[in-house]
Amino acid sequence: MGPPREARRSEVLRTLRSLEPELRAEGVRHVSVFGSVARGEDTVASDVDLALDLAPSSVPTGFQFVVYIDRLKRRLAAALSRNVDIVILPARRPELKEALSREAIPAF
């Protein structure tokens, strides 16, 4: 069955905070959790929805941006032992903006 939802959310936040120095070195300024994990509605099979605020000077462009995001996504998924979905801030889709304003829990 796995740990209770609040324990899973706390573990996700703890893990993200432990990665802060590494992520900041990669150009990540802030990370927030949103979606089912933030709402406490996740299951052990749920992915983790993360919103990343990136330092523009650290972010590659073109195809290298895709490689950069893929590397971040794989690193985060490995650390969290769960699939990860990433939204890059600022969110442009209205429904994402709304979800983030309602649900986002900052990790750092």
Residue ranges and their predicted role:
Residues M1-H30, A38-G40, V44, S57-F108:
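Catalytic core of pol beta-like nucleotidyltransferases
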Residues D53-A55:
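Residue-level recognition of strand-loop junctions within catalytic nucleotide-signaling folds
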